[in-house]
Amino acid sequence: MKKHISMLFVFLMAVMVLSACNSSESSSNSEVSSSKTRTVKHAMGTSDNIPANPKRIVVLTNEGTEALLALGIKPVGAVKSWKGDPWYDYLKDDMKGVKNVGLETEPNVEAIAELKPDLIIGNKVRQEKIYDQLNAIAPTVFAESLAGNWKDNLTLYANAVNKADKGKEVIADFDKRVSDLKNKLGDQTNKTVSVVRFLSGESRIYYTDSFPGIILDQLGFKRPEKQVELFKKQKDQFTFSTDSKESIPDMDADVLFYFTYKADNAKENEKWANQWTSSSLWKNLKAVKSGNAHEVDDVVWTTAGGIKAANYLLDDIETYFLKTK
């Protein structure tokens, strides 16, 4: 009898141990399952279904493409570069095999769906009207703006793809490069700098909240007093647009960088630029007469708007302030 009771006790203990193991395993599986998605706050609200480790990402802005590449991620699909067939020259090698899904202003929703993405990254300014369509295809995260501060957007994208630490590293590396360059520039940062862009029918002065403006400000450059006064009259500190050559004197500075938009209507834009740069007002600018008016690449200085372009812009600063002296 005692033998039977002993055997029964052993059996019950074994059942309890197995039950505990199964319960533990079930709990463990539940934790793994719950960790397969993440919650991300973005311009369109809060998404709680973002894959923990997305593998098939479609990106719908040029600056977003550069951000993903900097994070070590190659998207399966991306919108076409503003200039290039279909990518900017400096992105061609990195973007081999990536599907072109249309323009930033008009993504091809069907092409995106065919790629079966597990995450879509876009921008409220560009694609707010089709957010619901995109979100029905895959979890979709939107940045708020394209004003010029690419660091904010890169931080959001890094969080969305679960690479927040890598995002911080990318930004820290850029900031260190800026700091090192600022030290090399020394008192040259006391010079005033102006940034001008030509488009057909419109000429622009880019100020402190623009893509080049933010970088120049980080380097410590000043703006000419005329522009300081000009932008006091504006609500934004992004750009001043004009079609009157009488505004050319406002473009002057110790150093002037100018460029022409060539992604669309290139001939008309170049014709407009030539009309301005051949005028007597332009030729009489201090920067022009001193040989400190430099024509630079529109893609790098404003069109692309991403981390790679930002580094190329720093290359230009090194060239014109250090290497040509």
From Swiss-Prot:
Induction: Induced by iron starvation, repressed by fur. It holds the Pfam family Peripla_BP_2. It is found in: Cell membrane; Cytoplasm; Membrane raft. Disruption phenotype: Strains lacking this gene show a reduction in growth stimulation by the iron-hydroxamate siderophores schizokinen and arthrobactin compared to wild-type. Residues 56-325 form the Fe/B12 periplasmic-binding domain. It is a lipid-anchor. The modification Phosphoserine is found at S290. The keyword Flavoprotein does not apply. A lipid is attached at C21 (N-palmitoyl cysteine). The complex is composed of one ATP-binding protein (YusV), two transmembrane proteins (YfiZ and YfhA) and a solute-binding protein (YfiY). Interacts with FloT. This is Probable siderophore-binding lipoprotein YfiY.
